[in-house]
């Protein structure tokens, strides 16, 4: 009889333990499901926000060449910086009031921390740039996009336009040989008052860009006409470079290109 009672009590204990475990699992299962559902919603919300940010950043790049915006999108997905180089003559200026700095600062504020910038300026003609192998500076940057002001004003009276254009081709070809997906944009230097032969040079530069399929950012559209003395208000006294107001004018044009409204 005692043996039967012991077996009975043991069975009761086992049943109680099993019932308690089932009850505990039932209590914890609901919070766990709720927690997982909450985490899923948070993750989904985060994904939606990231996608909206991605689309917004791409919309700012709407003016860019297709190959540039595509590469930019890929860099965004990989969370890698997109490298932009502004290169050319001393018309690039230096310091916070120069057009490269103004453009870069505005792009950083608009897009966020998604770019690496480099500014390369030279007091050289295009021929000197090529002969001194300064193109290696561009190659070392491994840029995704290069905005080149190709020394056209420095070449004025020193290098014939045919040679200038050949030099531009050599520069671009050398960079593309090293990194074939680099995208080039061309732009003129600053305008000058009462220009004559300089206008002929730039007509040829623009034609070269169009025939080569290279976007030509003609910021002269933002300046007074070259026959208007008012243009001197935007240039240094010797007309060799834009002054502070000229840099602002130049920068505003480029900002409108790099940051689509």
Could you say what each language-model-derived stretch is?
Residues 1-83, 259-261:
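N-terminal secretory targeting modules
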Residues 149-150, 173-204:
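Active-site segments of SGNH/GDSL-like serine hydrolases
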Residues 75-160:
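Conserved SGNH/GDSL esterase-like catalytic core that processes O-acyl groups on lipids
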Residues 108-112, 143, 151, 173-180, ...:
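Sec-exported extracytoplasmic/periplasmic mature domains
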Residues 161-171, 199-206:
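Charged helix-capping and loop-helix junction motifs
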Residues 116-118, 183, 213-215:
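Conserved beta-strand segments of alpha/beta enzyme cores
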Residues 195-261:
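Catalytic His-Asp segment of secreted/periplasmic serine-dependent ester chemistry enzymes
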Residues 95, 154-159, 194-199, 226-227:
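Extracytoplasmic/secreted cell-surface and envelope-processing proteins
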């Amino acid at each position: 009889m005692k043996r039967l009672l012991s077996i009975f009590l043991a069975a009761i204990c086992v049943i109680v333990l099993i019932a308690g475990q089932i009850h505990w699992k039932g209590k914890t299962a609901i919070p766990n499901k709720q927690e997982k559902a909450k985490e899923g919603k948070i993750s989904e919300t985060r994904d939606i926000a990231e996608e909206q940010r991605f689309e917004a950043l791409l919309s700012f790049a709407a003016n860019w060449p297709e190959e540039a915006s595509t590469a930019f999108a890929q860099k965004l997905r990989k969370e890698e910086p997109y490298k932009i180089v502004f290169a050319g003559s001393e018309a690039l200026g230096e310091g916070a009031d120069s057009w490269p700095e103004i453009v870069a600062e505005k792009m950083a504020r608009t897009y966020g921390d998604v770019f690496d910038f480099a500014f390369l300026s030279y007091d050289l003609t295009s021929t000197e740039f090529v002969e001194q192998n300064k193109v290696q500076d561009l190659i070392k940057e491994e840029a995704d996009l290069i905005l080149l002001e190709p020394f056209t004003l420095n070449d004025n009276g020193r290098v014939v336009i045919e040679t200038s254009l050949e030099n531009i081709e050599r520069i671009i070809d050398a960079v593309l040989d090293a990194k074939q997906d680099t995208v080039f944009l061309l732009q003129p230097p600053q305008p000058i008052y009462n220009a004559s032969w300089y206008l002929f040079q730039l007509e040829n530069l623009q034609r070269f860009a169009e025939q080569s399929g290279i976007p030509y950012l003609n910021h002269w559209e933002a300046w007074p006409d070259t026959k208007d003395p008012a243009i001197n208000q935007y240039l240094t006294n010797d007309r060799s470079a834009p002054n502070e107001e000229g840099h602002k004018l130049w920068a505003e044009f480029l900002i409108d290109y790099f940051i689509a409204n």
